[in-house]
Amino acid sequence: MSAGLTIQLIAILISVACSLLGVFLVLRSMSMLTDAISHTILLGIVLSFFITHKLDSPLLIIGATLVGLLTVYLVELITDTNLVKEDAAIGIVLSVLFSIAVVLISKYTANIHLDIDTVLLGEIAFAPFHTEEIFGFKIASGIINGLSILILNLLVITIFFKEIKISIFDRALALTLGLFPEVFHYLLMSLVSVTAVISFDIVGA
């Protein structure tokens, strides 16, 4: 497979994986919150890297997911005080967590792949050069990761489509039916965090 085709395929996989979640997030008026998550997960990546010293460790995904959920929790916590509106709360949490991550990167991760330019800008053009061998075939890691997160998102949405749909359009009905909308809310946010960190590795923030 040519480098150009590989890049296009990776871009398509990541785009579709993100758009699957994006539909529900727009319906819930959470597009700005997910923008915050896509940046604050950088802190989880950095902290996990400090622990493992490996850029390919699964702990990076776990750390990023936890920070993504922390972002949602902090935004809701600040909003519930009624001192500021949700958009202001998002701005506060985004600025604090993302700036901490950038400071840590610039100060403690010199001369390694985890640098500010790579994180903020990304470079999908290099994706074809990072490959994994499967059944004797060399396949770009971006294709494997993109396809994996696409399948994960598709499976979760397919299995819980009814529950997610009811939780979005009628929270009271969801509670009446015992569907626990908060569970599906954080499930959706977890998928957003995982999808974002996979995309981070390929195209940056």
Residue ranges and their predicted role:
Residues 12, 16-20, 66-73, 100, ...:
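Generic alpha-helical transmembrane segments of integral inner-membrane proteins
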Residues 1-6, 54-62, 83-86, 134-145:
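Interfacial loop-to-helix junctions that mark the boundaries of transmembrane helices
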Residues 100-156:
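Transmembrane helix-bundle core of multi-pass membrane transporters
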Residues 8-13, 58-66, 89-92, 143-148, ...:
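Hydrophobic alpha-helical transmembrane segments
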Residues 1-17:
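Membrane-interfacial amphipathic/re-entrant helices at transmembrane-helix boundaries
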Residues 138-205:
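Helix-loop-helix "hairpin" substructures at the membrane interface of multi-pass membrane proteins
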Residues 23-113:
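Short loop segments and helix-boundary regions at transmembrane helix junctions
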